[in-house]
Amino acid sequence: MVEVRKGNFFQRWLYRNYRQGSALGNFFSRRIRPTAWLWMGLGGLSVITGADLRQSVVVAFSLLMLGVLAVGLIWALLRRAQVVATRDLPDTGSVGEELSYFVNVTNVGKRALREIHFREQGDDPRPTEWEFLNLKEPGEEDRNIFDRALAYYRWKWLNERGGKWQSLGRSKVLNLGGGESEEVRLKLIPKRRGVLVLDDLRVELPDPFGLFQRCRPTGNEVGEILVIPRRYKLPPLDLGGQSDLKIGGETASTVKGEGGEFMGLRGYRPGDSPRHMHWKAWARTGEPIVKEFEEVRFPRYGLVLDTNLRGSGPELFEEAISVAASFVSSMDQERCLLDLMFVSDEPSVFTAGRGVAKADRLMEILARADGNDEGGYDLLNSLVLRYATEMTSCVVVLTGWDEEREEFVGSLRQSGMKVHLYVIGAGEMPEEEGLLGAHWIRWDAVQEDLMKSA
């Protein structure tokens, strides 16, 4: 379980100052190129060493550098651009996997644009106050007391991993005459699941020396990409159950249809599909006749996701989503059915498998799933038990461990259902009776612990 802290006044003051300072630094870094910082550093050094006006060479060099910087800055500020852009985006992406797309840009102005670039402004990487107060940089406990108190390295670490997506640089150099269009390729890496919004494509207008650049917005529509959760590699799964065949259609099964071979003809029974009617035999006998097939029966599994954030927090919830997505992508749904169960605004069940829906549908649902910090486990417990008799076994993914969750798991086990329990937690697994047979997955070592869970 992750201990939730509200933080003291000093920590909240640090957060506000780091956040404001980061915004200011980001503004200048977009407009001042590294070469300009180098020139300004050399200029300052030459001023210090050239304090003696008799050293005419140093003075001349200082004035030259100052002049170049001034010309470059004024040039960049005076550049203008009228550009319209249209993105050609893929429907989906995946967390942690590079994604590329094309943008058609048009210079709607009369003046030609030379040596320009295009860049999608990345998502704000700054952490929330909750993240700054409650998440620790790996190895933070080994730092000295000064670094721990100021939490600068924690802020830096959170920024490196923050934001929903990260831009991978700018486009190639373009030269656009008035009214001309060209297609450019841009890349990014999604860092969080959900709907990725692209709404700030900028054209960069540098000065001739490459010291400064002006960043102007383009006329563009908002683009969206659905980012599915990160998926981890799982060891071989043995959840029990296998598909089998049953002759006839009298016994109810999970999936009915022409999955098996044709067996023969029989008389019509109420409920038989019109698609199975044998019209020639009906015309010959005068009685409705239907074709009979072997009925394929598939095992049905439950995948129960804990969306309760109490005592855990968003980080553990995100890893629980990824673990659930890993199970969805790993199961052979041509040979089974999979019920995804969780509680959002209300108890929900989504089924994928042969004859129902594809796994992609469950991935989209997981990409949009939200956590909540209200309510207990009564609704989820009732939902799972309602389908217990239909399920071969059930995979339960929890976002922490406490008394409420222990009672929930105990209720499922008492029903006679075979439960495969995965608990996303912090630190080592507590020695508790309710966790016997469970797979404890540390939120910061998910892949390693999943491979040990075989």
Predicted regions and their residues:
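An amphipathic, basic-hydrophobic helix/alpha-beta surface used to engage anionic
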Residues: G67-F350, S393-V397, S411
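Long hydrophobic alpha-helices with heptad-repeat/coiled-coil character
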Residues: R5-R30, R170, G249, S253-I289, ...
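Intrinsically disordered, low-complexity regions
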Residues: Q11, L234, E287, E432-E433
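Extracellular/lumenal glycan-associated context and N-glycosylation machinery
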Residues: M1-T86
